[in-house]
Every structure is written in structure tokens, then in C-alpha cells.
Amino acid sequence: MNTTYSSFTSLATLFVAERSEQSPVSYDRDTVITWGDFQQHVATLAQQLETQPTQNIALCFGNSYLFAVGFFACCHAGKSIVLPGNYQPEALKELSEHYDLLLHDADVSVSEQVGSLLVKAQSLVGITLINEPEAKQPYFWRELKLAEIPVTLFTSGSSGTPKAIAKTLKQLDIEVAILDNLWGDTVANTRVESTVSHQHIYGLLFRVLWPLCSARPFSAHNLEFPEQIVHHADADTTLVSSPALLKRLSEEHNPVAIRCVFSSGGPLPNQAAQHSQLLFGSLPIEVFGSTETGGIAYRQQHVASTPWTLFPGVEAELNHENCLKLRSPHIDENTWYQTADECYFHDSISFELRGRTDRIVKVEEKRISLVEVEKRLEQLPWVQESVVIPMEESGRLTLVSIIVLNDKGSDVLNELGKGKFWLELRKALRNWLEPIAIPRKFRVVDEIPLNSQGKRQVAEIEKLFQ
């Protein structure tokens, strides 16, 4: 596949800028979709959507190429875009107040109670729309007015009801331009493989919008297992991934050169960062941000204490609790946004993250930082990773923890047995923590339960103690 291109294009002028109809946009196995195909598919769907009376259209696709078709068809048809973060039928029903029509592909099952339109792909060569003829020619492309195109995303909702976050395509376009200014030369002439969903802001930006604006072809489907990365990636690949997958890479996987690796969605342990560099020859570029804020900062973790650098255009200061306060064009450049991320600034643009102040619980009137308990657990010589959560037990709030042991920890556990090992662990924690802050129950797991965005799955963790 020829992946040599030039120039970067704004989302506003993407469809009116000059580009060869034969340049590849997306691929799936041996099938390559060209720019000419993409234009035709977007035009076909846009014309159908223009006849729909509905305004708010939800997109829910397993196939990233069809998602891109749906996204830009909505833009050109003058529709508002809604991006549910969850494919599950009941979750889609729960969010139905936010949309009038759901556009989806065959990878997503939809309740009959939700108005929907199915988009099919035949080997990714042609796109078929239910009960609709081919696009009427010609279709006149126009420059998009980005500030007038609303895009609603949702927080992950892993421990509560998903929260709607309103953005505009202009805000997303600003982010894409910043990404290209920072790393455009690094990723030039690569193709994009991904392990994260385009339904969330990180995947939307890094695996769909930025590749389209910089004319880099992206895979229509995600890689789900470490073995697939090793098989599909090479020196002409940009990998968009998360700690959830990068932590699963092991010494058993054969090294493969990858041009650039991005990671976002949660903290990447230093051990995983260093192993990724050994395996891929590329130290992951970590991106810190959220659905609400967009990108905040980035770093390459040479050591665990490597500071974060603010993205260009992002202003930051600390409040009285040393929590990050932001102003940026990704949010609202005229107002400050308060986060719960405790930080220490080295200078005006670089800082260290200290944890989240909203992970404070009261146990028998004592304020306990779950972040600190996890930190103390991970300082022990036996523990690689930990998660601490509060749980109700017989009407009383207590702390419980799941831990991933390192090799030394596994050896000590086998030598002492569970009972004596937990006694030793609690004894060691008492050097830092009050008795009430020491978890009452522990479970050893092979890996922390995370979703595809790298967020902890609290419900799955709770099940381990029920």
C-alpha cells in the first residue's frame, strides 16, 4: 500500500481540498478503500440523511471506516452528532433521550424500541443503505462551518450514569491541528492500527480524525490481543493504544519495530512503558486528558517521575488544594475548568501528577485517600499493581483491594501461604497507614479489570468480593 502523502488539511476543508481519488483512506485485511470511495460513500449517506426530519443522530459502529462515513455524512447533512460510549442495547436505550435516530453497522445490536438505520458493508468495497438508491450525482461539497456542528460525547460511566459532554467540531479540529504540529513529522507516511474505540474522544481524534486530516490510512477494525499487534505492525505503523493492552505485552512476544506508539485512558506503569520500548523500539507517548477537557498534557516516561508537558494553547494553574485548573480552546477558552487532579508544577508548562482528590472516602469518620493506600501497596516489594475500593459490608463501609503480584510476591505467597502472606502484607502497611486505612480483604488477580479505554471496571472488581 502506497502511503506517501503531503500536507495537513483542516476538518473544515477536508472534502474540498485537493487529494487524489486513489489515495488510501482505510483498509481491512486485503481490502483498501480509496479517497474516491470515501467521498462516494459519504455523499450517498449524506443525501439520505438530508431527507430525514431527525436532527440528533447517534453513531454506534464497530467498523471505524463506516463510523467515519457516518460522522462526515452527518456533518454535511447538517445534523448534530451523538457518540454513545457503550454498544450494549440497554445502555443505548438509556441514552435515547439524547438522539432521534441511531446509525449503526452489523457489529452493533440495537433494541427494536430505538429508531435506527443500518449501514452495511460488502467486503468494505461498497456501502449499502437500506431502501435507498445510489447517490444522485453530482454531490457539491462545501467547506464545513465547524463551530455550528455539535458533537456530544459521554464519559465512560464505568461507576455511574454516563454524563453527556457537549463539544463542537471546531474544538476537535483545534486538537487535531495541535497533534499534527507536535507529531506530524514523526508519524508521516505511516498507517494507523488501534486497540481503542473511536466512540471515545481519544480514539475519535487519534485513530479517525487526525489520520483523515493528515492522509494516513487507518484500519477499519481494532486489534484486540497483543499477538495481533506483533503480527500486523511494522516500522510504517502508528499504534494507538492504551495501558489496558500495553500492560499485557510480555517477554514471550517477538520484538517488532513500530514507528510511534500512543497510550491514553489511564496511567501507564513505568515497567510497561519500558517493555514497550524494548519490544517496539518506541517509547510510548502518553496523553493525559479526559472527555471533558480533551488533551491536557503528554510525556514519554523515561522514568516513573518524568513530568508531563502541557499541550500548546493549554493554560493551567493550581487551586488551594493544589488541583489542576485549566483554560484551553478544547474546552472553553474564556473560562477556567476545575479538575480533581492534584499536581506539582516544576515550571509553567511541566508538572507531576499526584493523584485525584475525588478518591477520598470517609471510613468511621476518617478521611482516607484511596490513591495513597494504592501507592503504599505498590511500594511493597511484592506488589506490581493494586486497586483499592470502598465496599459496604454488614452496613459498614470498609476498604478492599485487588493486587497483581510481581515474581517475588508470587514466590513469597507460595512459600508462606495466603494466611501468613496477608499478615505480612498488613504488617508492612502499618508502617504508613492507620489500621482503618488498611484493606480488610484482598484478592490476587493476573491483571486489573479495565475496559478498552483503560478505565477501571469497578463493577467487575466488586464481583470478586461478593
Predicted segments with their positions:
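Conserved pre-ATP/AMP-binding loop-to-beta segment of ANL
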Residues: 4-6, 13-21, 133-154, 185-192
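C-terminal boundary motif of the adenylate-forming
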Residues: 380-395, 400-404
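Conserved C-terminal "lid"/linker of ANL adenylate-forming enzymes
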Residues: 361, 389, 402, 425-466
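Conserved AMP-binding/adenylate-forming core of the ANL superfamily
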Residues: 3-4, 13, 20-51, 167-170
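Gly/Ser/Thr-rich phosphate-binding loop
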Residues: 250-304
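Conserved ATP-binding/catalytic segment of the ANL
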Residues: 317-375, 379
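Conserved AMP-binding A3 loop
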Residues: 34-35, 141-142, 150-177
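AMP-binding/adenylate-forming
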Residues: 99-107, 164-182, 187-248, 285
